[in-house]
Amino acid sequence: MASMGEKEAVAELYDKVTSNGILEELFGEHLHDGYYEVGTVATISAHRVAVVRIIDEALRFADVFTDDQAKKPRNILDVGCGKGGTCVHMARKYDIQCTGISISPDEIQCAKHLAASQGLENKVSFDVGDALNMRYSDGSFELIFVIQCIEHIQDKEKFIREIVRVAAPGAQIVIISTACRNLSPSEKSLKPKEEKTLKKICNYLHLSGFCSLSDYSNWLTPLPIEDMKIADWTQNAAPFYTLLLREAFSIKGFISLLMNGGWTAVKVILGMKTIHEAIENDLLKIVAVTFRKTK
């Protein structure tokens, strides 16, 4: 993030989302997209399953947990850990030490409470911190997991360098993000209308901007990584946006948003609505990117 003011704005947004219980019924303890079979009609109960499934699908895509126990990572860093749901799920399901980091103090408090409520205090730990300047030593973690965090980071290239820095030699890195389309060979920039749409989303959700898949390739090329893979999960995530807008713009849903979250909640929904429109227009995609740090 470019300035302390921007960092504080992001922290404040998630503090309000967390403390006011905005969208709690939909998201539960997971503040990220879900993974559905293509063509599924999402429901609230199905989304509670989908937001967990996307974690397992990402780990499967990255070939992290195989039958070979010798290759099992000893620890995980979840960057932009939110309310701790991802850390708690991975620690419980895969019996692994997990550390989460978030810039939001309220999110970290929620995360610690969640871990304690499930008896996982010895498996999971959480830190308030800046993802661009993490306090961890070089090579500290054998798996790095990032889900819909990079959109908040101003200096995305530095962020990529930072997560590679804290990754151990041979560690797998998994990133799920909302990415903008690649430029065509004849383009020097996105169309003005597209730029306007992305700026609107960023203003609503305190995002710093979106990178493209080409950006990932350019940033990773000089780094000590190998075996990069990319998957387009846009259609797998799409049912969530339909569900969110259906619930939020119902009379009951909209009144609940205003009562519980005020203008902050309304901005979140308007931002998600604009993301949905950008996806429909092929401006944005939901992507999974994975690669391994060289040994």
From Swiss-Prot:
Species annotation: Catharanthus roseus
Region (SAM motif II): 139-147
Tissues where this protein is expressed: Mainly expressed in young leaves, and, to a lower extent, in mature leaves, flowers, stems and roots (at protein level). Transcripts levels are highest in flowers, moderate in leaves and low in roots and stems.
Enzyme class: transferase
Entry's Gene Ontology molecular function annotations: methyltransferase activity
Protein name: Perivine-Nbeta-methyltransferase
One cellular component (GO) term of this entry: plant-type vacuole membrane
Positions of the UniProt region annotated as SAM motif III: 166-175
Job description of the protein: S-adenosyl-L-methionine-dependent N-methyltransferase involved in the biosynthesis of biologically active monoterpenoid indole alkaloids (MIAs) natural products including vindoline. Catalyzes the conversion of perivine to Nbeta-methylperivine (vobasine) by methylating its N4 nitrogen. Inactive with picrinine as substrate.
Subcellular location per the Swiss-Prot or TrEMBL entry: Vacuole membrane
Family as reported in the entry's similarity comment: Belongs to the class I-like SAM-binding methyltransferase superfamily. gTMT family.
Pfam families the record matches: Methyltransf_31
Region annotation SAM motif I: where it falls in the sequence: 76-85
Superkingdom of this protein's organism: Eukaryota
Quaternary data: Homodimer.
Thermoactivity: Optimum temperature is 30 degrees Celsius.
Keyword vocabulary terms for this entry: Alkaloid metabolism, Membrane, Methyltransferase, S-adenosyl-L-methionine, Transferase, Vacuole
GO biological process, one term: methylation
